[in-house]
Amino acid sequence: MGTRSYRPYTPSTRQVTISDFAEITKTEPEKSLTVYKHRAKGRNNQGRITSRRRGGGHKRLYRIIDFKRDKRSIPATVIAIEYDPNRNARIALVSYEDGEKRYILHPNNLKVGTVIIAGPESPIEDGNALPLANIPLGTSVHNVELKAGKGGQIVRSAGATAQVVAKEGNYVTLKLPSGEVRLIRRECYATIGQVGNTDARNLSAGKAGRNRWKGRRPKVRGSVMNPVDHPHGGGEGRAPIGRSGPVTPWGKPTLGAKTRKPKKASSKLIIRRRRKSSKRGRGGRES
């Protein structure tokens, strides 16, 4: 897996960096594992926009991914590695000894023909799934459950990996990709290894059209709107926002204001908060 760039014969090809798709071995999805997925385009059940800047984009079929890895102690062979338009990670098609086929997230370095297995006694090899209690300290894992039997909920994006750093009582301590250190029940399952397509973070759309293909619409700054449309709007020329800090279109503080519930139940399981990440756009004062 790697990236591909182009000679700058147009402005967009000067900037674009795309995946070379070298690891893909099958172009058509497994029909029995795909379903039609209605795209909400940022609307709720009343048709009102609840998530701005979404809409359009290419049609997609949803691939049913096995996040639970609940087919225990039955070996499965990787028969294909495929592209999934619904996520930035690749997916692997595996065939179990009883003939059933399933999709899983493709771990880095997992090859076609490799045999994987899920269960408490599985060997510590990429693609195998085990309870956190049975995974040695220092091991890299992904697709981690937060509640036993619910299926993996965290560490699922391309290139993501968490590290097992401690075990004490009924909990295992994980260091997550965000830098957060938290406790997770020891009976929760996780998959060994790092999620594949590690170069996903190095890709560049190169042009607005590529984002439109993905269903991402333009983001208009509040300061160039009229006062009726945004609290930052109005003024003569390029006027400042006229406030002590940036706000949302509905007047709520944003870009740094804490939104986490102070009494959230999972707070007691977080040992160290995640690293701060800057979400400010150009100029640092827009939303």
From Swiss-Prot:
Q: Could you confirm whether the keyword Transmembrane helix appears in this record?
A: no
What keywords is this UniProt entry annotated with? Ribonucleoprotein, Ribosomal protein, RNA-binding, rRNA-binding
Q: Name one GO biological process term.
A: translation
Q: Where is this region: Disordered?
A: 203-287
- Which residue windows does the record flag with biased composition (Basic residues)? 209-220, 258-287
For this record, the Gene Ontology CC terms, alphabetical, are: large ribosomal subunit
The cysteines covalently paired via disulfide bonds are: none
* Record flagged with keyword Ribosomal protein: yes
State the InterPro entries in the record: NA-bd_OB-fold (IPR012340), Rib_uL2_dom2 (IPR014722), Ribosomal_uL2 (IPR002171), Ribosomal_uL2_bac/org-type (IPR005880), Ribosomal_uL2_C (IPR022669), Ribosomal_uL2_CS (IPR022671), Ribosomal_uL2_dom3 (IPR014726), Ribosomal_uL2_RNA-bd_dom (IPR022666)
Question: Where on the tree of life does the source sit, at the highest rank?
Answer: Bacteria
A GO term for molecular function: structural constituent of ribosome
Q: What does the UniProt function comment say about this protein?
A: One of the primary rRNA binding proteins. Required for association of the 30S and 50S subunits to form the 70S ribosome, for tRNA binding and peptide bond formation. It has been suggested to have peptidyltransferase activity; this is somewhat controversial. Makes several contacts with the 16S rRNA in the 70S ribosome.
Q: How does it assemble?
A: Part of the 50S ribosomal subunit. Forms a bridge to the 30S subunit in the 70S ribosome.
Q: What is the similarity comment for this entry?
A: Belongs to the universal ribosomal protein uL2 family.
HAMAP family, A to Z: Ribosomal_uL2_B (MF_01320_B)
Q: What is this protein called?
A: Large ribosomal subunit protein uL2
Q: What is the lineage of its organism?
A: Bacteria, Bacillati, Cyanobacteriota, Cyanophyceae, Nostocales
